[in-house]
Curated annotation (Swiss-Prot):
This is Hydroxyethylthiazole kinase. The gene is thiM. GO terms for biological process: thiamine biosynthetic process; thiamine diphosphate biosynthetic process. ATP binds at R125, T171. The lineage of its organism: Bacteria, Pseudomonadati, Pseudomonadota, Gammaproteobacteria, Enterobacterales. GO terms for molecular function: ATP binding; hydroxyethylthiazole kinase activity; magnesium ion binding.
Length: 262
């Protein structure tokens, strides 16, 4: 199994495209992470919108550059709104990304996410346990936490990518991005990133935005993982713990965009 690495030049090119196109991202995400997700997108140069009412969600999915479905705080009314948005995104050819939060631990959201797969997401982003559960390989995970190493989920990610046509991202100490054939590994980041709520969910929003960019979608998505890990490393070097990490992280994302424009 060959795992390719992303070059700095590829990452910088993708970030230049990101800043140039400034995708409008329709984030149907969980209640815990909305502000952090929006600020992450803004720091990188995208435009976030959190539209959740069923009628509006369907309408906005046709307007947005990309759609994110994150099931972290799933309810039946929210599931209805998400389904409507995904159906409209499919009709409008709006790329959409699925973040199957805790899908391995809870039956209702697992069934819902499996139903959504029939609408062919452009990308799927989850931890190892979530990706393996969604692929039907195993049930597991401790709520939103993974109990598996990311590398162990590569075969499941490849299967899921081939079955759905999505680019699948497995995040962990090393992130892996695959279209079912190619695999790109992204190293970096810091364990402190797991002590802040929302870093993975925010990454999913950035992945969604990258699906709207021209060029090689797999490389663009792998670049999103690289930016987040880079920013995490810079933020950890300047912070004293989780509380001071967040503002330094947002600053680091912003600085990355300024560097590629220089």
């Amino acid at each position: 199994m060959q795992v390719d690495l992303l070059s700095s030049a590829q990452s910088a090119h993708a970030l230049h495209l990101f800043h140039k196109h400034s995708p409008l991202v329709h984030c149907m995400t969980n209640d815990v992470v909305q502000t952090f997700t929006a600020n992450t997108l803004l720091a990188l140069g995208a435009s976030p919108a959190m539209v959740i009412e069923t009628e509006e969600a369907s309408q906005f999915a046709a307007i947005a550059s990309a759609l994110l479905i994150n099931v972290g705080t799933l309810t039946q009314p929210r599931a209805q709104a998400m389904s409507a948005a995904v159906e409209q995104a499919t009709r409008s050819q709006t790329p959409w990304t699925l973040d199957p939060v805790a899908v391995g631990a809870l039956d209702y959201r697992r069934r819902f996410c499996v139903e959504l797969l029939s609408h062919k997401p452009t990308a799927i982003r989850g931890n190892a346990s979530e990706i393996m559960a969604l692929a039907g390989v195993a049930n597991g995970g401790r709520g939103v936490d993974t109990t598996d190493a990311a590398a162990n989920a590569i075969p499941a990610a490849q299967t899921l990518a081939r079955e759905t046509g999505a680019i699948v991202v497995v995040t962990g100490e090393v992130d892996y991005v695959t279209d079912g054939h190619r695999i790109v590994g992204i190293h970096g980041g810091d364990p402190l990133m797991t002590k802040v709520v929302g870093t993975g969910c925010a990454l999913s929003a950035v992945v969604a935005a990258c699906c709207a960019l021209p060029g090689d979608t797999l490389e663009n998505i792998a670049s999103a993982c690289h930016w987040m890990k880079q920013a995490g490393e810079r933020a950890v070097a300047r912070s004293e713990g989780p509380g001071s990490f967040v503002p330094h992280f947002l600053d680091a994302l912003w600085q990355l965009t300024q560097e590629v424009q220089a």
